[in-house]
Amino acid sequence: MQDLPVTLQLGLIGDNIAASRSPLLHKIAGEQNGMDVSYLRLVPREMEQDFDGVFQYAKDNGYRGINVTYPYKEYVTKFLEVEDPLVRGIGACNTVIFGEGMPKGHNTDYSGFMSAYRNVRGNLAPGAVLMIGTGGVGRAIAFGLVGLGCKELRLVDRDMLKAEALAADVRKTAPDVKVVCGSNAEALADGAQGI
């Protein structure tokens, strides 16, 4: 195997990530693209630092980017420039790119959902959608649906406070989208074109 010419330093900040397969995934992806990738698990308590210290460490020590996972995806946003207004609406980032200026924040749950949808449905906007679950990934999917042109979103969750909070955030970011919340999926499914 020939020497790989580019070294790319990446990492994952989170708690309870010892079993993460991300280091291997990124190493293989790097090899497939002619890059030597180093991807380290950065666990604040193991590094005897808080999140702020670990984030600054990555920023100051040549990391090109980091992934951020539980419980830091919402907290990290205060350190980031988030260009996409829908990602700002989500209120959580799981990918950070370091470069000139402020670190840039992204949410790959959101962008990945939108990409997968477009691969299957093209530019066809979703109709009325019933979405069950309004947790972290549910928030990203809801804003992805808005980005795809959804005009009616029906949110179902056992935790109505969480569903109402998401509904309020969607309405604030996209006031033209009709958002309804409830706990009865069967009733809200009537007339829905997607679940």
Residue positions per predicted region:
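Short alpha-helix adjacent to the SAM-binding motif of class I
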Residues: 161-169
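Short helix-capping segments at alpha-helix termini
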Residues: 32-35, 149, 172-176
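Conserved beta-strand positions in the Rossmann-like core of class I SAM-dependent methyltransferases
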Residues: 40, 153-154
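Phosphate/diphosphate ligand-binding glycine-rich loop within oxidoreductases
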Residues: 3-122
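Short acidic low-complexity segments
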Residues: 174-193
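Short SAM/SAH-binding signature in class I
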Residues: 130, 193-195
